Design a protein with these regions (language model features):
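Long, contiguous binding/interaction regions
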Residues: 1-200
């Protein structure tokens, strides 16, 4: 029988080695909501603005609950945990209603950037989206956010301007080979307010 809600995907666990020790990568769990306050406290205002495309300092408790309680049929998030068990970063994908595309996001603790954690989180997200049958990943990035554009560009994403919003670019990664007939980008998601953190 078909389960209405997928069970926790234990098979999606990875470990990455860094000079300071091993970081665990795994799907997010509801209990990870307890790790969010300390995590967000160590994300700078500028990194918060670049992530949410708007200045936001305080997140109510319900945001952490929403971010950690997922319907795995539609959404997936991966966390990276430091050797001490602290939250180091989160990557996330939300599938479009047709499940052909997914909108991704990434946030890494400011003091831990530059160590390959963001790249590792994006790679496992790409691996998951491909295995889940999505055709492409898409994400809006501020035009000034060269670091994020460089990261996803290195992973194979194309970067295209958004004609009616010069402050933002669209990054797209096709997950199927061209001979598989991958559809064109930009068709899966309705336009949403780029200041709404719940949609990113």
């Amino acid at each position: 029988p078909h389960l209405a809600i997928r069970p926790y995907p234990t098979e999606w666990r990875r470990t990455i080695e860094r000079p300071e020790g091993a970081y665990e990568l795994r799907p997010i769990r509801p209990a990870d909501a307890l790790l969010y306050p300390a995590f967000l406290d160590r994300v700078s205002r500028e990194d918060m603005r670049l992530r949410f495309l708007a200045v936001r300092v305080h997140f109510p408790e319900e945001f952490a609950l929403r971010w950690t309680q997922l319907d795995y049929d539609r959404e997936m998030a991966f966390v990276a945990l430091t050797p001490e068990g602290e939250l180091a970063g989160v990557s996330r994908v939300v599938a479009a209603p047709d499940h052909l595309s997914g909108e991704y996001s990434l946030l890494v603790r400011s003091d831990l950037q530059g160590r390959g954690i963001g790249a590792a989180l994006m790679r496992i997200l790409i691996e998951y989206a491909r295995a889940d049958g999505m055709d492409r990943l898409e994400g809006m990035v501020l035009a000034e956010n060269r670091a994020m554009q460089g990261l996803v560009g290195h992973l194979g994403f194309t970067i295209e301007p958004i004609l009616d919003d010069p402050g933002v670019v669209m990054s797209t990664l096709f997950l199927r080979r061209p001979e598989d007939g991958a559809p064109k980008a930009g068709t899966g998601f309705p336009q949403v307010s780029r200041a709404d953190p719940g949609s990113r």
